[in-house]
């Protein structure tokens, strides 16, 4: 087959204009290969200008590129390796391994631009996705094939929570995880890789990175690379896959960096006019089908803590559950530092989770909310000024707060406590016993950093016998 060859006519930062023969214009989203100075640069067609020119976004650095260089149309979108051969490996946006471990034995190569599953293929059934983490399963449960937003500032434990989820999926569910680093720090990616190697989770995980130092084209597309690898496990192997995207805001940011160079007029706050469309194209592909599911956990950076900013606001519309990590809770030494009153879930509904789960979760939230209201009074007047009923609420709330903490498997090396996976029924039973007053005789310190309620009993009985 004869190659379709064009020539570079203009370069503006990461945006390249290439002239082809007018009857051979490459299609939108086609990958174009440019070879110069012994390097290979891949660009993606974004627009057709006039009769014979295409405007492309470079997925690598355009340093040293000049006009007149030959460009070859590959005839299709970027294709990335998929299948079991990708497990335990690290890839870049083009699906090339970057871990110096040799070639990848791929089952197939799939294009990164694919259409979302049709209505017929999607599964409307809503099922709870057990994570084994008490605070999440009880108060903001994840839906199988749902999308979860993980909100949190620096250093409150987003990455540790993500690693624990990856570990629990691999060990308890035997499932695969895809981790996509979008525009985040390379150091964090390195830490994650080293930690995963130590904990042995790496064998069930694929890592895809397009970090802060990459050009905007790469950061814009790397989420699609990770998603395509996840789709293979869902559609061909029938797996329930976990897809982590850290950070979805950087995906939007990269789109906005390129947008102006493509000649688009910016919209609100300088974002790209195609913002909702770009986010939708990514999010609509993350769903459950009749074959399997992709459950995604997306870390979301909130610019200047403003939730009404167009980037987080657009993402919110797609989420089924939000897990908010709070610095105040982390300061109390309660990990995971999930805010039990701020985190929400669409499936916390008696028709989906059942009456008992719904009742226990809402009662726990009521007790914690009342405790929050009483804290000012306690700070000024002390506990003695409270009514007997309020005193009881405070005692129970403090036990609940401590019981929401849990030792993680991935943090064993730091805490010295063995990790715990708590089944949903044990979680519900434990909190039910606290709110019904069956645990009123046990001091609150016994509830801190344990798994099930049985462990609280055991430790208490043991200490009583010792005395």
Swiss-Prot record:
Subcellular locations according to the entry: Cell membrane
**Which positions bind ATP?**
152-159
Describe its membrane topology.
Peripheral membrane protein
Group of enzyme by EC: translocase
Enzyme Commission number(s) from the entry? 7.1.2.2
Primary subcellular site in the record, as a coarse category: membrane
Q: GO CC terms for this protein?
A: plasma membrane; proton-transporting ATP synthase complex
Q: What PROSITE patterns does the annotation carry?
A: ATPASE_ALPHA_BETA
* Catalysed reactions, as listed in the record: ATP + H2O + 4 H(+)(in) = ADP + phosphate + 5 H(+)(out)
Write down the superkingdom of origin: Bacteria
Q: By its UniProt entry, which Gene3D superfamilies does this protein fall under?
A: 2.40.10.170, Bovine Mitochondrial F1-atpase, Atp Synthase Beta Chain, Chain D, domain 3, P-loop containing nucleotide triphosphate hydrolases
Alphabetical keyword list? ATP synthesis, ATP-binding, Cell membrane, CF(1), Hydrogen ion transport, Ion transport, Membrane, Nucleotide-binding, Translocase, Transport
Q: Which GO terms describe its molecular function?
A: ATP binding; ATP hydrolysis activity; proton-transporting ATP synthase activity, rotational mechanism
Give the function comment from the record.
Produces ATP from ADP in the presence of a proton gradient across the membrane. The catalytic sites are hosted primarily by the beta subunits.
Among PANTHER family, the record links this protein to: ATP SYNTHASE, ATP SYNTHASE SUBUNIT BETA, MITOCHONDRIAL
Q: Which family would the database say this protein is a member of?
A: Belongs to the ATPase alpha/beta chains family.
Q: How does it assemble?
A: F-type ATPases have 2 components, CF(1) - the catalytic core - and CF(0) - the membrane proton channel. CF(1) has five subunits: alpha(3), beta(3), gamma(1), delta(1), epsilon(1). CF(0) has three main subunits: a(1), b(2) and c(9-12). The alpha and beta chains form an alternating ring which encloses part of the gamma chain. CF(1) is attached to CF(0) by a central stalk formed by the gamma and epsilon chains, while a peripheral stalk is formed by the delta and b chains.
Q: What is this protein called?
A: ATP synthase subunit beta
Annotated source species: Caldicellulosiruptor bescii (strain ATCC BAA-1888 / DSM 6725 / KCTC 15123 / Z-1320) (Anaerocellum thermophilum)
């Amino acid at each position: 087959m004869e190659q379709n060859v064009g020539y570079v006519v203009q370069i503006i930062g990461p945006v390249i204009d290439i002239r082809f023969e007018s009857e051979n214009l490459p299609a939108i989203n086609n990958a174009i290969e440019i070879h110069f100075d012994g390097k290979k640069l891949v660009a993606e067609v974004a627009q057709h200008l006039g009769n014979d020119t295409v405007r492309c976004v470079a997925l690598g650095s355009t340093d040293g590129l000049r006009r007149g260089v030959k460009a070859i149309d590959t005839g299709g979108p970027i294709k990335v390796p998929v299948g079991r051969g990708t497990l335990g490996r690290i890839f870049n946006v083009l699906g090339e391994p970057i871990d110096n471990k040799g070639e990848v034995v791929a089952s197939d190569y799939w294009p990164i631009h694919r259409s979302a599953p049709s209505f017929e293929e999607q599964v409307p059934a809503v099922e709870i996705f057990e994570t084994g983490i008490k605070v999440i399963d009880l108060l903001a449960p994840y839906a199988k094939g749902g999308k979860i937003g993980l909100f949190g500032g620096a250093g409150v434990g987003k990455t540790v929570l993500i690693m624990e989820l990856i570990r629990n999926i691999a060990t308890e569910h035997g499932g695969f995880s895809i981790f996509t680093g979008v525009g985040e720090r390379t150091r964090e990616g390195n830490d994650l890789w080293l930690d995963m190697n130590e904990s042995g989770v790496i064998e069930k995980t694929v890592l895809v990175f397009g970090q802060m130092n990459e050009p905007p084209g790469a950061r814009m597309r790397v989420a699609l690379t990770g998603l395509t690898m996840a789709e293979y496990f869902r559609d061909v192997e029938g797996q329930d896959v976990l897809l982590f995207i850290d950070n979805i805001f950087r995906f939007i940011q990269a789109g906005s960096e390129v947008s102006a160079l493509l000649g688009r007029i910016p919209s609100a706050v300088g974002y790209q006019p195609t913002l909702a469309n770009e986010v939708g194209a990514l999010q609509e592909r993350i769903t459950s089908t009749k074959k399997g599911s992709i459950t995604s956990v997306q870390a979301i950076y909130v610019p200047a803590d403003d939730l009404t900013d167009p980037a987080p606001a657009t993402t919110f519309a797609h989420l089924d559950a939000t897990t908010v990590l709070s610095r105040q809770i982390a300061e109390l030494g309660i990990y995971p530092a999930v805010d039990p009153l701020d985190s929400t879930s669409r499936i916390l509904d008696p028709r989906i989770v059942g009456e008992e789960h719904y009742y226990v979760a809402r009662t726990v939230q009521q007790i914690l909310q009342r405790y929050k209201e009483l804290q000012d009074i306690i700070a000024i007047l002390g506990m003695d000024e409270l009514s007997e009923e309020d005193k009881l609420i405070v005692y129970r709330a403090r036990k609940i707060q401590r019981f929401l903490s849990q030792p993680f498997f991935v943090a064993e090396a730091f805490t010295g406590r063995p990790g715990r996976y708590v089944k949903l029924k044990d979680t519900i039973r434990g909190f039910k016993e606290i709110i019904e007053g069956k645990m009123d005789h046990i001091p609150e310190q016994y509830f801190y950093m344990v798994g099930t309620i049985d462990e609280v009993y055991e430790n208490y009985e043991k200490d009583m016998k010792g005395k």
